[in-house]
Amino acid sequence: FRGNLGHPEPARCRGRESGSSVLFTNRSIRPRRLEPERERAFWGVAVALFAANVRFGRIIVGISHNLVAREIRPMATEKSSSRSWMSDAAIYQIYPRSFKDSTGSGLGDIAGITQQMDYLERLGIEAIWLSPFYPSPLVDGGYDVADYCDVDPRLGSLDDFDDMIAAAHARGIKVIVDIVPNHSSNQHPWFKAALAAGSGSPERARYIFRDGRGEHGELPPTNWNANFGGPAWTRVADGQWYLHMFTPEQPDFDWSCPEVHALFCDVLAFWSDRGVDGFRIDVAQGLAKDLDRDDLDDYVVWCTNDQPEDGSHPVIDRDEVHDIYHEWRKVFNEYDPPAFAVAEAWVRPSRQHLYASPDDLGQIFNFEFAKKDWIRDDMHLAIEEGLESAERSGSTATWVMSNHDVVRHATRYALPQVPTGEYHRLPLDWLLRDGTTYREDRALGTKRARAAIMMEMALPGSAYVYQGEELGLFEVADIPWDELEDPSAWRTSRSASTKGRDGCRVPLPWVAADAPQLDDPNDEFGHGGSFGFSPADAKAEPHLPQPKWYKDFAVDVESADPDSMLNLYRRVLA
């Protein structure tokens, strides 16, 4: 942040009514995703099933018939002709540290993304979304941000970022970046200043500090546990406690502080001025908090979607959070076209429309596909709820099968499809035990994944594609525990509830011949190669190990096979 930290109110948000709250289209929409007519939805899915040769096609054929019966209407109202370019787009999520390493450091970087821009253009996507690339201690994969207006020097520079933006825009590809407004890194200058300033200071007002309970304040203010395990409060040297919904290294901002509002309005403007087209808002449901009540111990602060439907939870999905996004909308509308935003908000389907309305963020991820098994009724419900939520908000539907937080869908579809009543319980149990508890039927998982992308592209709205799913990658379940990076694993234990999310974050395979060398043919992981992720003369190994079976999924192998998953994606996205 390079602004006036002491400004009494948001620097970019003071009564500025420039522009319109209605987004408009500045790019023609490709024929494959025109108005969502009933016939198009049905026949698109039918062709998908035929092409994928899925013997369980009756699951989605049934969904298709129900969509026809429901009589899907175009989401158009009077806003139709001015909908955002994102209303009908395919967006490719890049996890930068695992996409392409241009320097040999073992970490993917910004220049690596630029190097592969032709690959992205050929894939046929309209936009790329970059997970955090900011300076960070990397406690949580970059979601612990130490500086919101710079590039982590291990990943490049602002000049590299500008080059990447220019390369993307030259190919007609938009760029979306991650914004992390719920918390910062504990290495952020603001938090260091808060620790130094002491209780009651303006510096501490930027974060959520509270006195403890008990005779000497030795007990935390509430009994909450954090999302990644352990308590949600950490005590500092002078005896106060600070809140962190995730790790102790990620202290939560206090959004009742005007300086926090000013910071993020200026951050949004900083990146928009550099040419960024939009923003993905991390933990969008968590910013507004009410800790001045007596029933706090009755709640949990985990980011699930089973909170109260009336916005009464003390820290998650409160109605006041939308005041923040209405403020941001004024910043977005200063640009022509207005900056785009999408909420990562794990909230009930009945609350999604609040985030997706045109005067709010404008779009919200629908994670129902990412949560459902390959079961007809579950998939049908996911589609119904997604369409209804979009219709209610005046926005467009979104479809997400995989991302950096969930087990890859090719693996989920390859495991037994047994409803457990809990989110991903079976895949997470399978992962926790290094992929040994259930048989992964990869042939079936691949067939289902092929059908799934065709179904997704037949539906109205935006599709989000996670890097590697276009290769048909499966989850890497057996990463050695001592090489895991995800705090949701290392803050628990091998007998706890999760092994973490690293299995979907393994660096991509680009060249099959550059395979790691195995000390023993039975070894799963080797050394000395990176499947083209890093340069041939790289001095460092990839930051996560790549399994030997990656050679069959390398980009060069799949590019040469007309029937590969990659070429299927290229056809359906073209």
Model regions and ranges:
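Serine residues within intrinsically disordered or low-complexity segments
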Residues: S18-S21, S28, S64
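Short hydrophobic alpha-helical segments enriched in small aliphatic residues
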Residues: P8, T25, A51-V54
